[in-house]
């Protein structure tokens, strides 16, 4: 299989358990870029954070941010951030959660929520089960998704995910998904891994992701990313 593009998550994949960018991943991604294979950042993070990571890596494939809610790539869409969905259902979910959880809502919602265009994020000082309980009785429960990224909990619009937006960005740029190698570590990475021709789980990935991957790295975090790029791309 020819790999024409790499799609990779940030937290827990190209960063370690302290959220530090792994030099090994950076080095491998730059070598792939030099060989003509671009890297796309696919993350639950805000698009500005993701784009900064893209620049630091020396990558050129663009960004899928907020679990698929936003897309950005230089020289695409007039260099404007493309918002795939609005916050209608997410805002309604926030209102419902605030009414149900009270002060617990304010204490646990992420400080970067003001920068998010399509989703809401909560620190893991609150559990997924507590948020699920808080969402009981929500009128539009079938319109939203609750993800655990390993570092935070995300309330997103069900119409999009990392996979659908990665596929859209690749199609817009003439890249066949069968020739994409996707790498991740957690629950919210499943959606974009299953769209790719080559599915890779880094060594520290959750078990269910490993079971549904074509290749499981022997190494963790960025060392796993380097391992996969050297094996399948370079």
From Swiss-Prot:
Key word Magnesium present: yes
Entry's EC annotation: 3.1.3.18
Catalytic reactions on record: 2-phosphoglycolate + H2O = glycolate + phosphate
Alphabetic keyword roster: Carbohydrate metabolism, Hydrolase, Magnesium, Metal-binding
Broad EC category: hydrolase
GO cellular component, one term: cytosol
Binding site for substrate: 162
Positions with a binding annotation for Mg(2+): 9, 11, 185, 189
Cofactor(s) for this UniProt protein: Mg(2+)
Active site, renumbered: 9 (nucleophile)
MF (Gene Ontology): magnesium ion binding; phosphoglycolate phosphatase activity
Signal peptide positions (record): none
Role this protein plays: Catalyzes the dephosphorylation of 2-phosphoglycolate.
Family note: Belongs to the archaeal SPP-like hydrolase family.
Name the record gives this protein: Phosphoglycolate phosphatase
Organism: Methanobrevibacter smithii (strain ATCC 35061 / DSM 861 / OCM 144 / PS)
